[in-house]
């Protein structure tokens, strides 16, 4: 018994087992009919579990649902957490119904964020417990106290660092690629050795590859496979054989090539072997030796290690010259695929024009070659028959055997008046001692004359040929037609002069067309609204034109339409074209009565089938001669059909002119006009047939009784209006618009009236303005699109946008004012007035948010109500006791009615709802060099601020490659006035180019550096939802002992329901339930997700932004440009020449400050894949079929286990891609996605230089100079210098320094004294830096920073040093050239110190001596022997003579 008691005591003393965790505190209880399932979850600070404890009373069985939390970070409250959107501390909260959901928090305790650039570590410091998160290319988070460091190891880190309430995003890059360092850090090598190896990895690769190739060739030389290299060595051996036989001195003893340091050999170069040198010499001298055997030498080279070693070095160099380093290739980088639709618009336009240009080029090419061939044939004929060609200018006289000039020649029988005198100038000798002989000189000047005339004719033919390409006919000028009062035939559309036709005009909106016409002074500014309202489609534009009732208005609208579609009537020159579709279809769908009877008549066949059009005129008088006789109705119908076809072909003024001629019965003028059209378009066969048919119909007698269609009366012009349509004829205008003004900063308007004016150019009604104020001196403003609002304070005053009069009325330009003063104007009642009513205002509302906002120019307290309207409220804590809870008074005691404020007036609000803000890198531009020195010498290595010297801030990291460019402008006696340079530069971030500006004579004037500081394509994205993996399932369930499941199961928003019937059975039922195969278990569930991925959707179109900078020695300036608007300033003229268009993805996902793209569900779409569970405004949505099970307990309720609720395919999100070229800027609720690695096009730049009087520059300049430099050695920023130069003359000065200077030549003027230079030094030059300017030596003081930063910080949209270095040096051999050779020579430099020059001289002398002995001396001796042979041969020849 005692044992039993002891066992019972021990059992009672042991702790009761609890699931998930022991202990914990109850945070919430909720007795309910529905029970929750057991859930155990962990967040960043605690663990939490829920369980159901059943209780029973008189009313039934209930569940006491309990939530228990156990803290893992017990002191996390010390950091003063606060709930915030986008926080980095995930905490699971318990709802009133014990449903679990995740919320985000941040700590309020202050935290200092810094970056140590020398150790590449992020430094975080705080005074209490705090939490940090680093997201981006690396992801780390945790709790800390005091100070912690996080090491960066990626080559370029794009990070968002969050600590406490602070968040900052920045871009940081190392000075070398870190993939090699990270790899070697995993081995036993120390960090310093790993860094040294990676810094010289290129030369290590070169040496290793050379050795591998050499070993491979050495192994192959042991086999016959080595002879595969024969094609490589045969040309070398053959070339060596030629040099051996012809260029080298021979040994006197053996006859082989001169060998001063070795004995005579036994093997000849031909392969023969001799025991003695005498036999060898006899073999060589007797001519028995066939010469150097190249094939034998090539075989020896294939087996030899010497050629193998040389070949291995050459092969390694060639391989590494064309291979990109592995380090500069980003793993997983997306490759660009260019689609045709993404090509620039100008390239598409070029594709449309290429066929025409190709035809012109072919014709020009054929004619040019034809002229060349003809010229060559004539040249050959001239060479063979010169005398016959020369006979045009001179004749041969057989009597005196001389040539005589034909000019002034007279014949006397067989003699002439020029006998005894030749064209060469020789006279016949009277004594007969000397006889004249015909020579080449007799006709040489006539041959030259003929050739000169031929060349002149040839050049004239070439000029005529090239000029014929650009010949263009002229039409009637538009401005001339506007001056005519009535319409004329030459002022209709087909005959208007449209100038040069460019097809890109079709893409211009009519607003731009109006601006162009206004710039050409073709229209008035009052005509522009009418032109801008022309419909964009052609059919709508033609209808719009025909609706105009006066000649000048219709002509103006038609001219604008033809200016856009400038080839509209040019299409009529042929038998097809987009502008001919309507009238040709109209003819095909209508039949002439005559053609029904005579379908084979040529005219009918032309109209219906398009054939026999050329002969349609010939049989009008044959088959159709008597058809219309006595048939006036058929005559009228057919002629109206032909005229209607002309109407569909020539709309607008042409149709109006035809209607005018018909109404006047001016048949002759009508026929004359149609003939003009036929002459204008002679190649249009169908149009010619219609015109001829109309002319034939006019010749018939029925024409006198012709009744044209009533349709033509609608096309007749009406008289131009002299009063506004809204005014009666008897009323007179009361406003004096001759004194009209348009005052600025007017927020209220009294006596508002609408104004109608007639354009002085076209007479069109202009009603885009309103008038305010006194009728004797009214003010006019642009008519508002939303009307005007009556002020709530003054009923006679009107405002814009709302009733508070916060917005200025838009003023009218001075150009429009001048036009209004010259025009006829009337006032009218303004109809769009919104009256102020008391019911529009409220005294209180349910507040949605509150804060202080910028309203116009003021800072007002604003309340946003539940109806999303904004109101002024000086009190934001006064409840309205007459309303429901949550209503706040807008005024003290709800005494004043407040009216809504237009949202566009509200900006920059500080709402009370917590919203996170993310800071960026601060860039400070310092103008003074001394202040810059102080800023960088304070060792603020942990600061997240960048300090830039203002005068050199726009220079690249690496000195650019220079190109020579000639200065342009107006040349004068002193130099160039209005000088400028033009160039092109790719729109790629980090691209730089140097310009060495020269005069037209080639004189170097100055250096300028162009730098694309940033180039990006970006879009703004708004948040849709968050998603993540399922960490648990919220469940509510109940059960019925008997009966079916409920038809409708109550559930909360976003919850899914489940049910299962026949769950009651023996041993599986609650206490008191006696049922078998009956009852039901039912409930609802919802996933608890951990917020890991946020999905955003694109809200704005892609914005292309490029910042281009030019830097001189004394100034620097930048401009931002986009592909749409060219930039024209006093310093710059910049525009995109070509534009590459890119499209950013519509939906992106953000995880840990990293962009992911791919197949992601949109908001409200729950298809299989990433994002099919969505958390929106704290509610989780999804779909699926819940899977659940239950455990039976004897006489107790069932334990429900929900195994799956939503279909969550979050695993698919892991397959999303992370584009390497995308960068991210986060903001409250939105993100900006930036693509910064694309070439956005080509920028055409024109830099204005002003007057450059280089011809007056002095060669010897007397100046006083001093300088100050500061910076660092082998770092990112290098050294910046400020020079103070004083001189009295202008000069172009070269700059020479022991270090690399970015500008090699500067322009010095008396008016400018401060000049800035950027210098790169690889070694410390001393306490001063020597710079020579125009032979003036400047010892600039030098203050160097000892810090050696290995990490560079940069704003998100700018490039870093490592990327510019990769772009400049893309191959391994380039890296070897920049670093490897220096590394090879570095040990010798350290060994010899200052005597390195003597060592280099000694080595070079030895190499030169060896070259002289083995190469130069044999060649010289061979040359000496050759000269001696020639001397001996000369002496032998002299003896023979």
Swiss-Prot record:
Lumenal side: 14-200, 327-365, 474-1395
GO cellular component, one term: virion membrane
Glycan-linked positions: 57, 490, 1177
Cytoplasmic side: 222-305, 387-452, 1417-1441
UniProt modification remark: Specific enzymatic cleavages in vivo yield mature proteins including nonstructural protein NSm, glycoprotein C, and glycoprotein N.
Known function: Glycoprotein C and Glycoprotein N interact with each other and are present at the surface of the virion. They are able to attach the virion to a cell receptor and to promote fusion of membranes after endocytosis of the virion.
Family affiliation: Belongs to the orthobunyavirus envelope glycoprotein family.
Designated name of the protein: Envelopment polyprotein
Annotated gene: GP
